[in-house]
Every structure is written in C-alpha cells, then in structure tokens.
Design a protein with these regions (language model features):
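Serine-hydrolase catalytic machinery in alpha/beta-hydrolase-like enzymes
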Residues: 5-95, 107, 143
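Active-site nucleophile loop of the alpha/beta-hydrolase fold
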Residues: 62-63, 122-130, 159-161, 181
Length: 220
C-alpha cells in the first residue's frame, strides 16, 4: 500500500493506493462519509472485492478531512476537488469505478458524468435527513435525483434499518438492501463484498457477463 498526496483547489488529499496481484484491469476510487475516514468496514469490503477482480484501488481522504474538519463544505467545492483527485489517478487509462459511503456516495454520483466513470458504488446512500422522508409537496428532502442523474450504472447498498432511508429499486441500476444493517453497514462486510463482486462482473470492459437491464438505464 502506497500513500500519496494529491493537491487540489481545496487543499491536499491523501490517497492510499493498492495494486492487485496480477495485471491491473480497472481502477476503483473510494471515499468516506462526511466526518469519517475511508477505513470503515463497508469501504474496505468494496476495496478487497475489487482488488480480487484485478482493480487498482485508491482510498481517498478528502481535503476537508485532511485539514481536520468534519463538515464537507459546499457541494460545488467538494465535487471540484474530487474531479481533480480522480483526474490525477486516472492517467493509466484503466476503466474507472468510483464510490463512497454516505456523503461520499453523493459526491461519486454527482461527479460520475464529469469524470467518465463506468460505474458508481453508493454505500449507505443518505436518501433524506434522518426521519424526514421526501414526499410529494415536500421538495428538497429526497436526494434520489443524485442517483438518477449519475449518468452511468449505479449500485446502491443500504441497510434495512438505515434512518436516512432506502432508495427505491428504480433509483439505480441495482439496489441491495442488507437485513439488520444500519447506516454504518458494519455487521456483514462479506455480504457487501459479494454484492459488489457480482455487480462489477456486469460492467462492460470489467466483467464477463452482460450488464443488467433492470433499474436505471445505462448511458447511451
């Protein structure tokens, strides 16, 4: 594992890069939740599953966390810094999959089109503030539009006890609801790894199986 610093318009990011045992086949860039670090059980389960399939993996500590802040700041600034990080990591030309947990999942969805991601892995996607589900006549409380606007294939993994809500099946290419899990997604990392490995196998240029035709349509 190699840790590098990448300078962005929001300050330095720290990135832990790992390589697969064999020839690299694709790149997976992952990040943390709003006040967290990228070494949570769910993020590490994704990293390990991806690396077993031949991915170069990059776990990103975003600039605001490197500074010691727990608040991400504006979405525009966060997204701009993320795009700069991914650009610095993507010079190999490998197919890109990006993702994160909670706030990091939102960043991955919002920037997927811009960075040309082949797929997004959204862990514990925070559909709405706790206890405030989005309903007709109450705009702005549901964040499902971020999933739908990703412009690429999206895998969502949420716990069935997540107070931030659970996306609907048609909000993404695949929505996996894990029984007994809360927003932390910490109880069954093996199930997360299995779901991620299965889904990665459907991505063109990465897997050997045809992509799923259910849920969100892939980009043309």
């Amino acid at each position: 594992m190699l840790t590098v610093k990448i300078m962005t318009s929001a300050g330095p990011a720290e990135v832990a890069v790992g390589k697969p045992a064999g020839r690299p086949r694709f790149l997976v860039v992952l990040t943390h939740g709003a006040g967290g670090t990228p070494d949570t059980a769910d993020v590490l389960a994704v990293r390990d599953a991806a690396r077993a399939l031949g991915a170069v993996t990059a776990l990103v500590t975003q600039p605001y966390r490197v500074r010691g802040s727990r608040a991400p700041g504006s979405a525009a600034r966060q997204d701009a810094a993320w795009a700069e990080i991914v650009a610095a990591l993507s010079d190999s030309g490998l197919p890109l999959v990006q993702g994160g947990r909670s706030n990091g999942a939102r960043v991955a969805c919002r920037t997927a089109r811009q960075v040309g991601a082949a797929g997004v892995i959204a862990l514990a996607f925070p559909l709405h503030p706790p206890g405030r589900p989005g309903t007709p006549g109450q705009p702005g409380k549901s964040r499902d539009a971020e999933l739908r606007a990703a412009g690429t294939r999206v895998l969502v993994l949420n716990g069935d006890r997540d107070p931030f809500g659970i996306p609907e099946p048609d909000d993404a290419t695949r929505v996996v609801v894990l029984p007994g899990e809360t927003h932390a997604l910490s109880k069954n990392p093996a199930a997360i790894g299995e779901a991620v490995a299965s889904w990665l196998g459907t991505l063109p240029g990465i897997g050997s199986r045809p992509p799923s035709v259910s849920g969100q349509a892939p980009p043309s």
